Amino acid sequence: MKVAFYDTKPYDRASFEPLGEANHIRFKFFEDKLTEDTAPLARGCDAVCVFVNDNVNAAVIDLLCDMGIRVLLLRCAGFNNVDLRHASGKLTVLRVPAYSPYAIAEHAMALLLTSIRRIHKAYIRTRDFNFSLTNMVGFDLHGKTVGVVGTGKIGRCFINICRGFGMKVLCYDPFPADDPSLSYVPLDELFRESDIISFHCPLTPETHHVVNAESLATMKKGVVLINTSRGALIDSEALLAGIKSRKVGAACLDVYEEESDIFFEDNSGHILEDDTLARLISMPNVIVTSHQAFLTEEALANIAETTVRNLLDFAEGKLGANEVCYRCAK
């Protein structure tokens, strides 16, 4: 079997090539993202493999189908970049539902600790032999209230970490987990009562810009926001205004709503044209990482193994829980 592999990075090759050789799968690696212009690169392949910022819209789906491709392999959990409605009945869409919930939950906590204990500032200062503690005062996590939006595997891992710090945890999820230890509250109450809010939910029409000017107004002054899920959960302009007004005490972002042409690439020699992102990065109380929360050895191995297994199952006519369909995703 041949697979057109888009948006390839060196760590993708390292994890997928050995599995491909062992399972008689030939990966054709392309650094380009999947778009209408690059879709023809998949001609002659049996499947297409994409990541979070590949654009699988209706036009791309039609191009792939015209070339005889019948399966789309997502090497990620999210599927908001795929037009599932248009793919229905044309392409089988298979995903990796949970490559490492620990990786993402731990990264969320790493961002939080870095922010509130000024680790990023201390690192830069001490490299210049500046050992002053001026403007380095943080705060304890113990006793603080953290709101967790989304209590799937990642959200629950983050909750367990927070409990280890002695934090009070409030939860919101439209589909609550069957766990009596979790304290669920309405979303507006979570926003109102939390000192820290961490997002671990998918991007849907309902969650798009769930953090906006109106919802920010209901939050505590000095609230800390963490987003390791999808960038468009947060209205970036509203966040910027909230930081400038000091309503938001800190923002810890591993994702950004307009990241697709910026993240995963070295832009150090270029002028960043996204003024909002540039201003956010310039803020002393904002930490931005480049969608790297998933990036651990364990997660990369799981992504590769699950993606290859999805393809082999498809070839054998076996479709399981990893299939994403329009009807199920609504």
Positions of the model-derived regions?
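Glycine-rich nucleotide-phosphate-binding loops and adjacent flexible coil segments
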Residues: I226
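Short acidic/histidine-rich motifs immediately flanking catalytic phosphotransfer sites
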Residues: A42-A47, M67-I69, R192-I197, K220-V223
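Rossmann-like dinucleotide/phosphate-binding beta-alpha-beta segment
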Residues: T134-K221
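Short glycine-/small-residue-rich Rossmann-like dinucleotide-binding loops
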Residues: V52-N53, D195, C201-L203, S229-R230, ...
